[in-house]
Amino acid sequence: AERANARLAASGVPGRIHLRKNNRDAEGNGFGCHENYLVRRRGDFWNDARTLVPHLVTRQILVGAGHIAGDGDTRPAGNGLRDLRDYVFSQRADQMWDAVSSATTRARPLINTRDEPHADVEHYRRMHVIVGDSNIAQGSTLLKVAAMDRRLDYLEHGGDLSDLALADPMRAIRDTCHDMTGGVLLERSDGRTITPLEMQAEHLGRLRDHVAQGIEVTALHEAALELWERGLQALRLQQPEIVDTELD
């Protein structure tokens, strides 16, 4: 953009070019940031997909790109929907309407379950996540991808996250998005409540325990786990300067 603006100025052309990276246009139409993870073909793919939902609902407190909600943004309010105009965690959260589905344009799910592995179909499936924001900070992308990679590895090693299931993921993703403290109470399927901060901390703790059992991890994975912890600390203490050069 800077080079283009320099050429415009040198040519005497008025105006200025701005480059933006987002997941929605001025009319509120959305477009996804797609993440694709290669997973082993197992009989419990659907269970794994549903197990990932609480993380995908709440990870926006760390890797959301931020958004000023305006016209076209709605969330449940009583028996209807109300317009919102405030700063929120994620551009995508208010546009998602299902947890897992193969109907990506009609239902806008967190996870697209169509069986399109783009690999050896006998051995692999694709975990296709479409709820994420388009990030600019490299740290955000690292944390977003590495956290999912570790979580999928945890599940493939027999880990269980089903006890953290949410009663209403679509309400939870909106409530999480619009509470910038990370402290809103989300109802779990077992009737108990948990905050997005607590949900992310619980996931991080289980993955750290998993790694401590001797699971091989790369330096990037270690960096992501450390950034994850500092990101939660920054939100818990309301001190964004702890990670303000690393996360969007």
Task: For every predicted segment, state its role.
Residues A1-R20, L186-R230:
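Active-site acidic/histidine clusters and adjacent loop/turn architecture
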Residues G12, G158, G214, R236-Q239:
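Short, flexible coil/linker elements and helix-boundary hinge sites characteristic
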Residues W46-R50, D83, T105, A201, ...:
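Low-complexity, intrinsically disordered regions enriched in charged/polar residues
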Residues E226-D248:
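Substrate-recognition/cap regions that form aromatic- and gly/pro-loop-enriched pockets
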